[in-house]
């Protein structure tokens, strides 16, 4: 098993959710799982809505990105989480 870089797309529940606070919660949650958060980008979508794209580095293992996605989806201000890119390092 190797190391993978994963780009996730995290959608907040509304445009009113503070981008910086959500990014900090995402980073804290990921790092509490002993996963490295390399970068976080925030991209505007429409009507004030935005998406947060954390880039994480983790060990390739059974279950893939599911544990991380579930942990982030359980955050109060998160509507949805999906993997948009996975590559072996």
UniProtKB/Swiss-Prot annotation:
Q: Which UniProt keywords apply?
A: Elongation factor, Protein biosynthesis
As one GO molecular function, the record gives: translation elongation factor activity
Highest taxon in the source lineage: Archaea
A Pfam family (short name) is EF1_GNE
Record-stated family: Belongs to the EF-1-beta/EF-1-delta family.
What role is this protein assigned?
Promotes the exchange of GDP for GTP in EF-1-alpha/GDP, thus allowing the regeneration of EF-1-alpha/GTP that could then be used to form the ternary complex EF-1-alpha/GTP/AAtRNA.
Q: What is this protein called?
A: Elongation factor 1-beta
Question: Which organism's genome codes for this protein?
Answer: Methanococcus aeolicus (strain ATCC BAA-1280 / DSM 17508 / OCM 812 / Nankai-3)
Give me the gene this protein comes from. ef1b
């Amino acid at each position: 098993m190797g190391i993978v870089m994963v780009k996730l797309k995290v959608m907040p529940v509304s445009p009113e959710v503070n981008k910086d606070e959500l990014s900090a919660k995402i980073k804290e949650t990921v790092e509490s799982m002993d996963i490295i958060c390399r970068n976080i980008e925030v991209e505007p979508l429409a009507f004030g809505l935005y998406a947060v794209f954390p880039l994480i580095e983790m060990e390739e293992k059974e279950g893939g990105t599911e544990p991380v996605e579930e942990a982030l989806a359980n955050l109060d201000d998160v509507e949805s989480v999906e993997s948009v890119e996975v590559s072996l390092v």
